[in-house]
Amino acid sequence: MPKRIKINVPLVLSFSDAEKQGTIQPHDDALVVTLRIGGYDVKRVMVDQGSPAEIMYLDLYKVLGLKPEDLTVYSSPLVSFKGKIVVPKGQIRLPVQAGTDLVEVDFIVVDAFSPYTAIMGRPWLHSLGAVSSTHHQKVKYLSGGQVLEIVGSQSVAR
């Protein structure tokens, strides 16, 4: 009996034009997803590969039932989308689940207006080994030998 040759083909994280199906094109929508944060399904989470940090807005912090004593000190001021200085309330580490993968994330908690509940930035994307595409409205990452994806919601982003 001849031996089978085992060929290992590396999985590639890529996006094709066919994957735009189901999205409204052309668009300039933010990538807005639902993630499980701290054990709760949280909607209106923006994925921003330009953000150097994960941000949680105070409204979400309160909805999750977290208290001021749950925060650790975070004293570096941030700059808002409008260019204003925002002093964080503090920082908190919470689990964020994507599919079956769980990543501990340090959120900077801020009291500022936002149409989003949280912003997931580069640290989360990198720890998950993920690649995002606002054009395709998806986040892709490798898990258990397969490519998994989180699909954004254009209707929520608008």
Please place each PLM-identified region on the residue numbering:
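Short linear "hotspot" motifs
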Residues: M1-R158
